[in-house]
């Protein structure tokens, strides 16, 4: 059997960069890691509760966290930031207060910035959310996959592979279905590949969605 390494970790330092930028003493490292998870969960929960697009997408591509002794800087990369910035100062301030309360950080300043990504459907996380929304609405998985590929073609990517695993269309036996368009060179370290694995709960059970997008060659 072929062993598949995570494409993002495989390319760290060449075409991929870390989403958390900070240093810690070895004993304090686990605390910093837990803090990062709390921040990301808190932001995602807030966005889920307060924002609803028709398809039920959050539109968060990634959350970058930079920490200094007296400051935590959070950058949220979103595909559709209008949803969070309709009444911008109030929403962002409310989100900042929520995160601060969750972390209970009194002696550190917390900044939140929101950045729009130019091609939302060129990002695997947003695409996975789109497919998940379609599957929840009982759209056939093939139709959902093809629609996702159409959207990425508009985003100017060089190749995409989509895989869905589980009880597809409510069938008794779980199986894996996949579709590929263009080139997806997973073995080439210089190839910039974005990857995402996403879990969606449907009425038939849990489905796993994996997406590989070949963006460009370094």
UniProtKB/Swiss-Prot annotation:
Coiled coil: none
Compartmental location: Plastid, Chloroplast
PROSITE patterns linked: KH_TYPE_2, RIBOSOMAL_S3
Record has Ribonucleoprotein as a keyword: yes
Keyword Mitochondrion carried by entry: no
Gene Ontology BP term (one): translation
Keywords assigned: Chloroplast, Plastid, Ribonucleoprotein, Ribosomal protein, RNA-binding, rRNA-binding
HAMAP family, sorted: Ribosomal_uS3_B
Similarity comment text for this entry: Belongs to the universal ribosomal protein uS3 family.
Subunit structure, as described in the record: Part of the 30S ribosomal subunit.
Protein name listed in UniProt: Small ribosomal subunit protein uS3c
Lineage: Eukaryota, Viridiplantae, Streptophyta, Embryophyta, Tracheophyta
